[in-house]
């Protein structure tokens, strides 16, 4: 497969420049016959989750295609689902560059992107043009300049706009790169947010005559007590699913490596054990009452199987996809 050569060339570039270059090429072919260049045939292995049928259990995690620019090209690679975003009500530039760093020896990434995106209205226009036949998730967040106390308003604004176009909606309250965002995972703040989101979902279901499930994305850095409380809140408010996990602030497995001290969330192989343990504990607490989408450090069939054995119904990749490329999709789906 050609990807090792592509990766070698891309890794000569700054990580964000490599991402921009790749997406520039994918944008050129998305929706054209040249999609055949990235298309690969993967087995159909249907999975039911959140009332939806996924053509296979492997999805693309949020963060790679923030604005939904390359849905069809990414879909051609064989993903059973694609989660675009995180998108916010208004466009925002994100944090200052540089803000994305490779930990090559650990096959990890550290990012402090800060929800850089072109806004929800732009994303919707891109979704309207797409012809992807898998499940499309849309991951939503709050603008950086929206006070945390008013954060739920941003989620509701996004829900209003994306509801007709989403297969499911992911609520991102766990990015470490938006000040104060993770506080929405706790206690009354979480309950208040989930009540508002569930009420909005009920209203939108009546308006659009369709039910779009809601999944909440959580951090891997929760304590045992916090995890129990989160699980309880998700069940009490009839949330449809949980995505575990986002990136970690823990650097214990990458000490001494180049870029290890950069501020931001760590993803990739160093996150695998931590996220799997959160999934295992979450599965015990939830006891089958809502499904788990497992993400964090999956870069092989074995890693994907570990997530499913721990309790995940579906799995997602991001950093592993950067390091291993499209062949990883086929490898996982064929052998999971």
UniProtKB/Swiss-Prot annotation:
Tell me the GO BP annotations in alphabetical order: 'de novo' pyrimidine nucleobase biosynthetic process; 'de novo' UMP biosynthetic process
Q: Where in the cell is it found?
A: Cell membrane
Give UniProt keywords alphabetically: Cell membrane, Flavoprotein, FMN, Membrane, Oxidoreductase, Pyrimidine biosynthesis
Can you tell me which family this protein belongs to? Belongs to the dihydroorotate dehydrogenase family. Type 2 subfamily.
Annotated binding of substrate, by residue: 66, 111-115, 172, 177, 246-247
Which InterPro entries does this one have?
Answer: Aldolase_TIM, DHO_dehydrogenase, Dihydroorotate_DH_1_2, Dihydroorotate_DH_2, Dihydroorotate_DH_cat, Dihydroorotate_DH_CS
GO CC, sorted alphabetically, is: cytoplasm; plasma membrane
Could you tell me which CDD domains the record lists for this protein?
A: DHOD_2_like
**Which PROSITE patterns did the record assign?**
DHODEHASE_1 (PS00911), DHODEHASE_2 (PS00912)
Quote one Gene Ontology molecular function term. dihydroorotate dehydrogenase (quinone) activity
Q: What is this protein called?
A: Dihydroorotate dehydrogenase (quinone)
For this protein, what is the EC number? 1.3.5.2
Active site feature: 175
Keyword check for rRNA-binding, yes or no. no
Broad class of where this protein is predominantly found: membrane
């Amino acid at each position: 497969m050609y990807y090792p050569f592509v990766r070698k060339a891309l890794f000569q570039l700054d990580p964000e420049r490599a991402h921009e270059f790749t997406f520039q090429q994918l944008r050129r072919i998305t929706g054209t016959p040249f999609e055949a260049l990235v298309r690969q045939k993967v087995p159909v292995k249907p999975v039911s989750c959140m009332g939806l049928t996924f053509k296979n259990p492997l999805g693309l995690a949020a963060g790679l295609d923030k604005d939904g620019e390359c849905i069809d090209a990414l879909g051609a690679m064989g993903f059973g689902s694609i989660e675009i975003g995180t998108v916010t009500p208004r466009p925002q530039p994100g944090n200052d560059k540089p803000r994305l760093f490779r930990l090559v020896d650990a096959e990890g990434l550290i990012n402090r992107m800060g929800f850089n995106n072109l806004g929800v209205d732009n994303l919707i226009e891109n979704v309207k043009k797409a012809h992807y036949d898998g499940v499309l998730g849309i991951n939503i967040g709050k603008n950086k300049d929206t006070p945390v106390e008013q954060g739920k308003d941003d989620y509701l604004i996004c829900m209003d706009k994306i509801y007709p176009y989403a297969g499911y909606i992911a609520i991102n309250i766990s990015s470490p790169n938006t000040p104060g965002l993770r506080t929405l995972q706790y206690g009354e703040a979480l309950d208040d947010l989930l009540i508002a989101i569930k009420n909005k979902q009920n209203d939108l279901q009546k308006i659009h005559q369709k039910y779009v499930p809601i999944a909440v994305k959580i951090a891997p850095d929760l304590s045992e007590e916090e995890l129990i409380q989160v699980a309880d809140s998700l069940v009490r408010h009839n949330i449809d699913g949980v995505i575990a996990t986002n990136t970690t602030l823990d650097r214990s497995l990458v000490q001494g490596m180049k870029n290890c001290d950069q501020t931001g969330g760590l993803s990739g192989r160093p996150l695998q054990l931590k996220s799997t343990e959160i999934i295992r504990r979450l599965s015990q607490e939830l006891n089958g009452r809502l499904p788990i989408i497992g993400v964090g450090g999956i870069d092989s069939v074995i890693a994907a199987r570990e997530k499913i054995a721990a309790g995940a119904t579906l799995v997602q990749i991001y950093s592993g996809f950067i390091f291993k490329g499209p062949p990883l999709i086929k490898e996982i789906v064929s052998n999971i």
